[in-house]
Amino acid sequence: MNLMNPQPPADFSQEEAQRYSRNALLDQVGWEGQAGLRAGKVLVVGAGGLGSAALLYLAAAGVGHLGVVDGDAVELSNLQRQILYRTHDLGRRKVASATEPLASLNPHCRVETFDLRLDPGNVREVVQGFEVVLDASDNFPTRFLLAECCWQNQVPLVSAAATGWHGQLLVALPGSGNPCYRCLVPQAPPEKAVPPSAQAGILGAVA
């Protein structure tokens, strides 16, 4: 451990102290921030290209509780950018396949899975209990549904999208005077303007 770095709290094991030592060296994080990450609960909706990368980095960073929502199975065309999965995962449910690499990367991270598609009947039940939601879904109905639920329940929302050579990121923090997702994206673009995700090209590294 670097002598310039304050000692970790007593409830951090020696293994955890070494694992997260580079995080703790950052003034904006420190051991207090690392303890906050360990207590954190983040829901990731969509375990595709964006969700795969986000889940790996969140687990590596030490977020203690990750939720994963996805209702699809792993397909061969996914492997070009969805780095959570391997060839032997083909045909398996994504949420089941995702738990293994995340647990292997960081066994201190609890992973909760939801093998489903969000709809008005289940979205609130899924979101409740999480402190931050990352929307990495690939369609506007899900984005709008999730944005409304997060706004109504005062849950910060990070919404991300990627296609072709481009990526987009939007953060909606519920609170007086702050804009919501629908304030900035009031309606979905015309269908002809945005091809379905399965028909759109994307460079894997963009995700």
Which functions belong to the PLM regions below?
Residues 1-207:
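Adenine nucleotide-associated cytosolic modules
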